[in-house]
């Protein structure tokens, strides 16, 4: 994100974006509507009913891992390269993309992260309390 403006969004949120003029580090999940510039590319799924924030975040990690280290400012990460990249997805017993697994996995990571953050805040408060009382 480059900042906040009062202009109306040009692109719908709930999608993965990347820049076709930089490295693979500029791959992001955009949860809300945004203003897209000419070099911001979007990844659009063939079937969209099963994609949500958690499944996109799971795919994002796979997509970034697949692209990582292959590009720099001389070797651009273009839309044509992105279209040809093969990303290995989790599949269920029917050999279909396992959206339920991706949803559950990312949901669990979010819950663990929140629990760790709460524990960190508690420890930090206790450290402040001890420092103030000494």
Residue ranges with predicted function:
Residues 1-86:
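DNA target-recognition domains and sequence-specific DNA-contacting regions of bacterial/archaeal
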Residues 85-134:
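Amphipathic alpha-helical coiled-coil/heptad-repeat segments
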């Amino acid at each position: 994100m480059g900042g906040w403006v009062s202009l109306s969004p040009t692109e719908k949120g709930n999608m993965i974006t990347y820049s076709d003029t930089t490295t693979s580090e500029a791959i992001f999940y955009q949860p809300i509507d945004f203003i897209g510039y000419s070099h911001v590319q979007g990844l659009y799924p063939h079937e969209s009913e099963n994609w949500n924030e958690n499944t996109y975040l799971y795919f994002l990690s796979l997509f970034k891992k697949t692209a990582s280290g292959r590009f720099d400012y001389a070797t651009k990460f273009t839309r044509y390269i992105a279209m040809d990249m093969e990303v290995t997805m989790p599949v269920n017993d029917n050999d279909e993309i396992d959206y339920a697994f991706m949803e559950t996995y990312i949901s669990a990571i979010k819950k663990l992260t929140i629990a760790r953050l709460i524990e960190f805040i508690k420890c930090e408060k206790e450290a402040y309390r001890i420092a103030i009382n000494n």
